[in-house]
């Protein structure tokens, strides 16, 4: 783990032999993999020892159909034909994508592609598997499945697993050892309990800790906890249960004064006409994949709404219908009163701006200034005025106006893409995994900017698999599964509905799950809590009251 630009992907490239065989530069020292010096053997030889799953999955895919993607590596490595079928079937089943075997890769969601890439590499049985942010496009349940699969491969096949990842809660649960990189050097290393005890040091360099670890560290600072930091909800629940005086039990009916509740939608949000309306929308792709059924949804100015659900639930299809890229088979989608089926997509684009999961897919100019001004020029704004407005936004974001966007870090490129959205002042913004690939500090910068846009009246709809981010920033969520909306409502209330979360294969944020358990087993004082500081405050208050 580490902030953007820390050297994580470069380290992964060293392990796979891409450095120095593909990426050239000044190289000192040695990298030994399974007894081989990567500088002294060919990249072909290294690839038979080390399997790699890249951060940008589309650059890794070589076939058009899932089965062919699985076969490609096995056939190239000369695996006997009588073993290939068994390996393909077993690996697809292990990763949970047997149903995708005959699907065209172009029709898969980002998360489904990620699973295919992992399965294709696992099928080749490498000695070492290096994964660069393998769960960036995956929902929480699928992310857990990937890590369960990796742990099983480690235990049963003896494969050494090296993962570059931002989801610290998963790392803390599944990894034996954690290395923290900063400025190309190892800043911290050790077992998860040891590393995540350094909360302040980690956050100073742009790395988050599991929320329950933050709770432990805060209670430890107040003399209420000691020993090994908590890494999961079970450990945190036992800790707080042991701290709180036995007098405070589930029979308590009064929460301490000032107990927080999930934030209400902004008062102005529903005073205006809706900017987006889905009315009983139906859609299915020609190949029969990824249909949505009976979608009804309303979005008001100033709202920040999260769309959650597992991969393949229909979230991406919903956003494509919203932007006019897809037209409903029945029902209607209205954007600022415009029927998307009756007007060109270019007209809808004047009202809706999209921030892609991968910013490189929407950057097309040679300088940051030209990139940010581009949308204004497309809207007919005079170039001089477009450049003036773009410069104001660039200055606010602290970006280098004259630099080439692709010379910047992944996080900075995301900020360039966001600046391009902000400058056109859209009525609706669609965010597709806005924090994917960002470190903690960059994530907070992006989301605070998005929240400011909402406060100024922009309606924001956010597809996001990071439930912590959704909990922190979304006022409402829409829960989807199998192309349908299961429910919609206040964020905390729906995340606390364990039956709903199970139906949608969504894992609620750590703090909300912890508060739900504590409200049931310790005291209702913990109900409706969604912040680390609130859990700590209520615990301290209950201890003080004795």
Protein language model regions, located:
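Conserved ABC ATPase "signature" region
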Residues: 82-100, 384-401
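Conserved ABC transporter NBD signature motif
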Residues: 25-36, 331-339, 348
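Helix-to-loop junction immediately C-terminal to a conserved catalytic motif
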Residues: 16, 323
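Conserved ABC ATPase "signature" C-loop
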Residues: 184, 482-483
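The feature captures the beta-strand-to-loop junction immediately N-terminal to the Walker
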Residues: 1-3, 308-310
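Conserved ABC ATPase signature
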Residues: 104-108, 112, 404-408
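Catalytic Walker B motif of ABC-type/P-loop ATPase nucleotide-binding domains
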Residues: 129-132, 429-432
């Amino acid at each position: 783990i580490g902030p953007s630009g820390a050297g994580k992907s470069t380290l992964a490239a060293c392990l796979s032999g891409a450095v120095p065989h593909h990426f050239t530069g000044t190289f000192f020292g040695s990298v030994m993999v399974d007894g081989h010096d990567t500088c002294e053997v060919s990249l072909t030889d290294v690839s038979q020892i080390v399997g790699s799953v890249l951060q940008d999955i589309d650059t890794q895919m070589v076939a058009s159909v899932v089965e062919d993607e699985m076969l490609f590596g096995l056939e190239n490595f000369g695996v006997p034909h009588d073993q290939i079928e068994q390996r393909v079937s077993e690996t697809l089943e292990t990763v949970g994508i047997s149903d995708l075997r005959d699907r065209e890769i172009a029709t898969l969601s980002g998360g489904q592609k990620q699973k295919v890439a992992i399965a294709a590499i696992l099928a080749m049985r490498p000695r070492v598997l290096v994964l660069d942010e393998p769960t960036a496009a995956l929902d929480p349940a699928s992310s857990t499945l990937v890590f369960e699969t990796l742990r099983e491969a480690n235990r049963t096949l003896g494969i050494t697993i090296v993962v570059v990842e931002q989801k610290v809660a998963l790392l803390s649960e599944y990894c034996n050892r954690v290395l923290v990189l900063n400025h190309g050097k190892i800043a911290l290393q050790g077992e998860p309990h040891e590393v995540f005890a350094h909360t302040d040091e980690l956050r100073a360099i742009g790395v988050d800790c599991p929320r329950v670890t933050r709770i432990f560290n805060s209670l430890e600072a107040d003399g209420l906890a000691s020993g090994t930091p908590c890494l999961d909800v079970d450990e945190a629940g036992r800790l707080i249960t042991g701290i709180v005086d036995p007098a405070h039990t589930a029979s308590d009916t009064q929460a301490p004064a000032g107990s927080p509740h999930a934030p209400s939608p902004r008062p102005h949000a529903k005073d205006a006409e809706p900017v987006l309306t889905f009315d009983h929308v139906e859609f299915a792709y020609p190949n029969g994949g990824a249909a949505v059924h009976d979608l009804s949804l309303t979005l008001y100015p100033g709202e920040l709404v999260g769309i959650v659900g597992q991969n393949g639930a229909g979230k991406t299809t919903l956003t494509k219908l919203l932007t006019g890229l897809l037209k409903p088979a029945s029902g209607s989608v209205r954007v600022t009163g415009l029927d998307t089926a009756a007007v060109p997509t270019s007209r809808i684009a004047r009202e809706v701006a999209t921030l892609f999961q991968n910013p490189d897919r929407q950057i097309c100019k040679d300088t940051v200034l030209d990139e940010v001004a581009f949308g204004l020029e497309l809207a007919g704004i005079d170039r001089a005025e477009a450049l003036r407005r773009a410069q104001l936004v660039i200055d606010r974001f602290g970006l280098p106006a004259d630099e080439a966007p692709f010379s910047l870090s992944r996080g900075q490129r995301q900020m360039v893409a966001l600046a391009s959205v902000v400058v056109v002042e859209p009525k609706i913004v669609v965010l597709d995994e806005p924090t994917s690939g960002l470190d903690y500090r960059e994530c907070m910068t992006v989301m605070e900017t998005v929240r400011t846009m909402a406060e100024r009246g922009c309606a924001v709809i956010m597809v996001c698999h990071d439930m912590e981010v959704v909990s922190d920033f979304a006022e409402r969520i829409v829960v989807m599964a199998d192309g349908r909306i299961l429910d919609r409502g206040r964020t905390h209330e729906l995340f606390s509905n364990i039956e709903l979360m199970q139906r949608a294969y969504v894992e609620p944020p750590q703090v909300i799950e912890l508060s739900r358990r504590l409200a049931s087993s310790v005291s209702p004082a913990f109900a409706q809590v969604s912040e680390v500081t609130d859990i700590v405050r209520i615990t301290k208050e209950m201890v003080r009251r004795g």
